């Protein structure tokens, strides 16, 4: 089934990359302000991250929402765990927690 292949891909990406951002567009060409904001935060922190464009495949985008149980994008994963979207990433950045999570 395609869903299983998508879930397998997602699991593989978050397992094999310390930081993954499922986003609208790419880090070089963001396609929404929320994705751009998270990219800017990660860049300010000097973090290398894997970016995955959710616009490439509508079925993948829907499967990712099911996988994460999170309805919106971007979705930031650190060390295999969903951190959240733009608002949560921004809040964690502003209070210093995001940097701690990334260094730990």
From Swiss-Prot:
User: Where is [2Fe-2S] cluster annotated to bind?
Assistant: 32
Q: Which domain of life is it from?
A: Bacteria
Q: Which SUPFAM superfamilies does the record associate with it? A: Thioredoxin-like
Q: Which GO terms describe its molecular function?
A: 2 iron, 2 sulfur cluster binding; disulfide oxidoreductase activity; metal ion binding
Domain (Glutaredoxin): give its ranges. Answer: 7-104
What family does the entry list? Belongs to the glutaredoxin family. Monothiol subfamily.
Q: What is this protein called?
A: Probable monothiol glutaredoxin 2
Give the originating organism. Answer: Rickettsia felis (strain ATCC VR-1525 / URRWXCal2) (Rickettsia azadi)
């Amino acid at each position: 089934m395609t869903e299983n292949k998508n879930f397998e891909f997602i699991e593989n990406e978050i397992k094999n990359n310390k930081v993954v951002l499922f986003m609208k567009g790419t880090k070089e060409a963001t396609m929404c302000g929320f994705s751009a904001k998270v990219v800017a935060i990660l860049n300010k922190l000097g973090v290398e991250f894997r970016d995955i464009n959710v616009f490439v495949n509508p079925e993948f985008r829907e499967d990712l929402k099911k996988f994460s149980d999170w309805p919106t994008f971007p979705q930031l994963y650190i060390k295999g765990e969903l951190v959240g979207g733009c608002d949560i990433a921004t809040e964690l950045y502003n209070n210093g927690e995001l940097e701690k999570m990334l260094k730990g």
